[in-house]
């Protein structure tokens, strides 16, 4: 299949996803419109802040693409920021849309990026960025535990045996994956993943065939993955910090919705700061919940349930959780539309 046909396939997949999402809201169109009207002008910063978030994501990805271990003199300065920014938005739009939740945008990014740089460089940079995206997630979840404990220490949030147990499980969960990521960054990930898939009944033949045909290519990609951390730690940590920062900025959309409902912890600088920390915890728990069940197409129902549970855990009303989940779904649809339109922008 030609690259143009694949591009068209991704384009129509995105359109189909928007249609499905419009008809799978848990509320009627009348109720949906009421929620949008309730958001009012707050919808502008809620949607608009994602320009900043995607911009930070693009800067993080650019650090990987332009790292001294991956780029060659012929590829110096390629691709430009605007190109990376567009592919970032479109990639995430496809991630929201595809049945393999959170992974559908990667093949498209490799396909498009290979027009600017070598295929191996494109594949390794996309894989590295996907790893960095998830790695930053774990650091976000891990640090959120200490935010919760800090707020509990000042009496702002409850703490008991059940909550402490859950927090302890999350800490262990994060530490295990920190170890897995450390191995991936030291030795690469592609070949080991194919070997692992080969142990699954029915996939042994396919895995062996891929290693036989493209083994050298996969080993070269793994070498580029491993060399980022080993030889260009500055680019690695800059990319990680930027990805982590994007999660913090993402929490501002929940902050806007809390302020919309008059929830500001007493107002003033201290009150707004506490509210922002609550927003970070809400986003952290919701994204953890959504990623644990991330295989669902468009994470239907998962994000909504995560918002309701996380908001209720902070002692806020379930109605607020439903409102936040619906407005976030509206924001996703808007950005999916933007993403698929950018696919056709030359």
Identify the meaning behind each predicted range.
Residues 92-101, 117, 130-142, 146:
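Mid-bilayer segments of alpha-helical transmembrane spans in multi-pass integral membrane proteins
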Residues 81-83, 116-131, 317-327:
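Membrane-interface alpha-helices at helix entry/exit sites of multi-pass transporters
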Residues 89-107, 204-208:
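Short intracellular "coupling" helices and adjacent cytoplasmic loop segments at the cytosolic face
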Residues 1-89, 157-290, 322-324, 331, ...:
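Predominantly cytoplasmic-facing regulatory/coupling regions of multi-pass membrane proteins
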Residues 93-100, 281-304:
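Transmembrane alpha-helix interface/packing and boundary motifs in multi-pass membrane proteins
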Residues 102-114, 143, 295-313:
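Re-entrant/interfacial helical elements at transmembrane boundaries that shape
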Residues 141-155, 313:
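Transmembrane alpha-helix termini and helix-breaking/packing motifs in multi-pass membrane transporters
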Residues 69-78, 113-122, 313-319, 346:
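Juxtamembrane helix-boundary/capping and inter-helix hinge elements in multi-pass membrane proteins
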């Amino acid at each position: 299949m030609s690259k143009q046909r694949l591009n068209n396939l991704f384009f129509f997949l995105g359109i189909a996803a928007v249609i499905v999402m419009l008809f799978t809201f848990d509320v009627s169109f009348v109720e949906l419109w009421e929620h949008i009207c309730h958001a009012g002008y707050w919808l502008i910063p809620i949607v608009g802040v994602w320009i900043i978030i995607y911009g930070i994501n693009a800067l993080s990805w650019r650090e990987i693409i332009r790292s001294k271990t991956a780029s060659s003199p012929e590829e110096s300065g390629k691709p430009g920021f605007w190109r990376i920014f567009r592919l970032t938005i479109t990639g995430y739009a496809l991630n929201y849309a595809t049945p393999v939740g959170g992974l559908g945008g990667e093949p498209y990014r490799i396909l498009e990026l290979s027009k600017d740089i070598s295929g191996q460089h494109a594949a390794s940079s996309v894989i590295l960025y996907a790893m960095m995206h998830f790695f930053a997630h774990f650091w976000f979840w891990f640090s959120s535990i200490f935010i919760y404990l800090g707020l509990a220490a000042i009496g702002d949030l409850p703490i008991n045996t059940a909550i402490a147990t859950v927090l302890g499980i999350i800490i262990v969960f994060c530490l295990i994956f920190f170890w897995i990521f450390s191995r991936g960054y030291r030795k690469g990930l592609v070949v080991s993943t194919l070997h692992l898939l080969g142990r699954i009944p029915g996939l042994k033949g396919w895995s062996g065939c891929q290693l036989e045909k493209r083994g050298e290519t996969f080993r070269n990609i793994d070498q580029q993955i491993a060399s980022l951390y080993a030889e260009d730690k500055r680019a690695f940590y800059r990319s990680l910090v930027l990805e982590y920062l994007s999660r913090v900025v993402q929490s501002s959309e929940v902050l806007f919705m809390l302020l919309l409902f008059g929830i500001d912890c007493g107002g003033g600088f201290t009150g707004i700061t506490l509210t922002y920390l609550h927003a970070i915890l809400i986003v952290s728990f919701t994204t953890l919940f959504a990623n644990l069940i991330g295989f669902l197409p468009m994470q239907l129902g998962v994000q909504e349930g995560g918002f309701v549970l996380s908001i209720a855990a902070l002692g806020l009303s379930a109605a607020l959780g439903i409102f936040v989940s619906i407005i976030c779904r509206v924001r996703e649809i808007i950005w999916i539309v933007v993403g698929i339109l950018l696919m056709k922008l030359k």
